């Protein structure tokens, strides 16, 4: 059946502290005394500016190249300010591999969750796609990926072709997540549960479109699963979580 981690460590990069606090409080309340939840900081090493610049994706097929000095400097400034550059896409699995190298090796039994503003992509069908979450060690949730990853309603792309993207945002603002969306902390809770189920069972997703473990590919699916569904977890996963908690008690 699996087992819950004894400890969950949350990291934030470029996101407001209240985002991490919201996940912290939620998991603390959800899991009770069986799991310790705490916050930490990713301590980057001296390689970071070059490594991060070298992980930039240059094209739809995952093209990369030797970084320019200016790109390395931009990454260095971003690390100093704890504010990653906007609009840059990174190779998601390679980014995860680098972050993994910064974590203590003895902590693999713990669940590490990094919430970042970086745009992360992975290859599927020969094309790189922006991801909302990457599941592994550590698990990484991208707030920018939550906004840019799941496809927006078809109406959005029609407005974009007509040059009226801002008009669409004004009319249909509740149908898609936006950067700095006040609903993001609530959405992050559901994605943190996906990371939890991945760590505990190896199976983070659910086919029930109303379950917060549903793997949404469209914004309206994400909005429904995380914000509008009459229930948080489907009966199957609600019962599974209770069983996992008993095993941790």
Annotated model-derived regions:
Residues 1-124:
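Propeptide-to-catalytic entry region of secreted or membrane-anchored zinc metalloproteases
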Residues 9, 14, 132-183, 200-249:
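Metalloprotease/metallohydrolase-associated module, dominated by Zn2+-dependent proteases
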Residues 18-21, 182, 186:
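Generic alpha-helical secondary structure signal
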Residues 187-199:
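Catalytic glutamate of the conserved HExxH
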């Amino acid at each position: 059946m699996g087992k819950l981690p004894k400890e969950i460590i949350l990291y934030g990069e470029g996101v407001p502290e209240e985002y991490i606090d919201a996940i912290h409080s939620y998991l603390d309340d959800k899991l009770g005394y069986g799991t310790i939840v705490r916050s930490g900081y990713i301590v980057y090493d001296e390689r970071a500016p070059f490594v991060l610049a070298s992980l930039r994706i240059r094209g739809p097929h995952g093209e990369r190249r030797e970084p320019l000095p200016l790109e390395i400097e931009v990454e260095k400034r971003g690390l100093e300010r704890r504010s990653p550059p906007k609009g840059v896409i990174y190779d998601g699995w390679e980014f995860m591999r680098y972050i993994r190298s910064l974590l203590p090796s003895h902590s693999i039994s713990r669940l590490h969750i990094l919430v970042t503003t970086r745009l992360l992509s992975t290859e599927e069908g020969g094309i790189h796609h922006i991801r909302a979450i990457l599941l592994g060690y550590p698990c990484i949730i991208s707030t920018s990926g939550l906004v840019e990853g799941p496809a927006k309603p078809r109406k959005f792309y029609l407005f974009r072709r007509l040059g009226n993207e801002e008009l669409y945002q004004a009319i249909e603002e509740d149908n898609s997540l936006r950067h700095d969306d006040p609903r993001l902390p609530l959405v992050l809770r559901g994605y943190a549960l996906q990371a939890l189920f991945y760590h505990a069972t190896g199976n983070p997703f659910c086919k029930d479109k109303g379950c917060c473990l549903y793997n949404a590919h469209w914004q309206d699916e994400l909005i429904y699963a995380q914000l509008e569904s009459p229930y948080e977890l489907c009966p199957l996963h609600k019962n599974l979580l209770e069983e996992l908690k008993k095993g941790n008690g």
